[in-house]
Structures are given as C-alpha cells and as structure tokens.
A protein has these predicted regions:
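N-terminal small/glycine-rich loop or linker at the start of catalytic domains
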Residues: 1-13, 75-78, 143, 189-195
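Conserved N-terminal beta1-alpha1 strand-loop-helix module at the mouth
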Residues: 1-49, 54-59, 80, 115-120, ...
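Hydrophobic faces of well-ordered beta-strands that scaffold small-molecule active sites
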Residues: 4-6, 33-35, 104-106, 136-138, ...
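Conserved, mostly hydrophobic/aromatic
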Residues: 7, 25, 36, 71, ...
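Active-site beta-loop-alpha junctions enriched in small/polar residues
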Residues: 9, 38-42, 50-51, 109-111, ...
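Short, acidic/polar
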Residues: 14-24, 88-92, 118-120, 162-173, ...
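Metal-dependent phosphodiesterase/phospholipase catalytic core, i.e.
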Residues: 49-160, 179, 199
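C-terminal active-site rim and adjoining tail of enzyme catalytic domains
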Residues: 82, 159-240
C-alpha cells in the first residue's frame, strides 16, 4: 500500500508549513507529513521553506536574522490558499506538541558545515525529548546536512532528497547510510524504484497532485507519495 504524506502539511489547502496546514492534513486522516526547517537567530528550529521571509510573510530578511520569539508573530499566509485567520510561523516544538503524526519527514535545506551540525543535533535533542526518534526522518539534498547527520546523529533516520539524476541518487543515498529516498516523481521509473527498494530504501515521491499520476505511481509500487492535497490523495487511493 502506498502511504500518503502531506507536503508542508496540506500546502494546496491551507497556508504551507503552518499549524493550520498540518491540522488540515490530519483532518483527512493523513498522519504523515513533510516539512522544512531553518534555524532562527537564537538557534530554534523554525518551520518554513525558504531561507528568506518575503514569499510567505512579506517581511524582509532571512530567517537566521530573526529570533524565534519574533518569527512566531509573523503571519505566513501570503501566497497560499485563502485563509481567514493569521497563521504564524511555527516552531517545530509546537507541532510536536500539537500534532499526532505517525511519521515526519523533516527536510533541512542546504547549510554550512557548522549550521548543518547545529541543526541535526537540535533535531535529535527535540526528537528525544518528545519521544519521536522512531517517527522522524531527517531529509536533505545537501551533502553537508547528510554528512553531519551520519556522523553526529547516526541513530536518526536519514533520507536523500533527489531532484536530478546527474548523480545516481541510489548510490548517493547509500553513501550516507540513508533509509529513505525522497525522489522527484519525474525520476521515478519502475527500474529505479525496483533497484532502490531492492537495496532497502523507502522510496517517497514528490510532489504528486494529479489523481491519474497518484494512481500510476501507486501501481508502480512506490512506498509513499508526498502531495499538496492530502484530501484528494486519500479519495484517490483510498488510504491515509
């Protein structure tokens, strides 16, 4: 059975990477999610996709230039589906406290060696504190992040985010001891899927929003798909 992950919560239905979006995902019975993390100026894990604030909050500057106490007051509704109420940028901790997901894909964007190390250690500390070590996979396309995760937090599950095939994504994933391969759906051929699964990788494809494509990838046998529309996915595939 192909599992469903809500992309940034339910990005097509509610403001991405906000509490409202993750609650919307859970309303559909989808208890797996993908989200993006950046560090605040004071080292807290903030749930936001871009390194800058402009696209979702219309504020200036980078996430890393603002302290968490300020970031959680910024309304992140801009550019998404219409939403009546303000949707502030959440801390990861708030989501761990308020959302009962069975599994979390925590994507860490590219980072310097120092920031990568700080980020993966912070994730591990929070996952331990909230008892979700077995429910978390740290994913990234950044070699620095995956290297830091392998060396500093080897007991955290890891996943390679692969958008291009110019380097063999299966080989790269294996090189960092990954358990998951988060694959751009355009790269998901039956041959690559079979090879990855044969080598023990959970293959999670993104971002899949068309019902016909959902069915085709499920027929291929992908382990999971990541979608902006978890409600549509459950209606199409009949599972959460």
């Amino acid at each position: 059975m192909t599992l469903i992950y809500g992309h940034r919560g339910a990005k097509g239905e509610a403001p991405e990477n906000t509490l409202a979006s993750f609650e919307q995902c859970l309303k559909h019975g989808v208890r797996r999610c993908e989200l993006d993390l950046h560090l605040s100026k004071d080292g807290e894990l903030m749930v936001i996709h871009d390194p800058t604030l402009k696209r979702t909050t219309e504020r200036r500057g980078k996430v890393i230039e603002h302290i968490a106490a300020d970031l959680v007051t910024y309304d992140a509704r801009k550019g998404g589906p219409g939403w009546m109420h303000p949707c502030p940028i959440p801390r990861l901790e708030e989501l761990f406290e308020k959302c009962d997901f069975e599994h979390w894909q925590l994507e860490v964007k590219s980072a310097s060696r120092t920031r990568a190390a700080t980020t993966v250690l912070a994730i591990r500390e929070m996952a331990v504190r909230h008892g979700v070590m077995d429910k978390v996979t740290v994913t990234s396309s950044s070699r620095e992040v995956l290297k830091a995760a392998l060396e500093l937090t080897p007991d955290l599950s890891r996943g390679l985010v692969a958008e291009y095939a110019w380097l063999d994504p299966i080989k790269v994933a294996q090189g960092y001891g990954c358990q998951m391969l988060a694959l751009n759906w355009t790269l998901c051929t039956p041959e690559r899927l079979e090879k990855a699964q044969r080598q023990g990788l959970h293959v999670s494809v993104w971002t899949v929003n068309e019902p016909a494509l959902m069915r085709r990838l499920a027929d291929f046998g992908v382990d999971s798909l990541i979608t902006d529309f978890p409600g549509l996915a459950t209606a199409t595939l009949g599972n959460g």
